Curated annotation (Swiss-Prot):
This is Large ribosomal subunit protein bL27. GO terms for cellular component: cytosolic large ribosomal subunit. Pfam families: Ribosomal_L27 (PF01016). The keyword Ribosomal protein applies.
Amino acid sequence: MIMDLQFFSHHKGGGSTANGRNSAGRRLGTKAADGSIVTAGSIIYRQRGTHINPGENVGRGGDDTLYAKVAGVVKFERMGRSKRKVSVYPVAE
């Protein structure tokens, strides 16, 4: 007579899984807050797509990053009910 006993003193093989990995965050979002002073070329907002549109004195890079074209004060504004834009207004010295 053949008996097959399993005495759970060791873990059996764990097997494998298709899950269990993740990618690092892309550090998107606001880099210069409303009312802050920026220099020309400063990144204001990093995004994928156009969540926020460029306004006065703000350019849009190839990856949709918004940056200041001139030195000044950052101002986030509404465009109607749902859209938003960011502008940079020069400071009078």
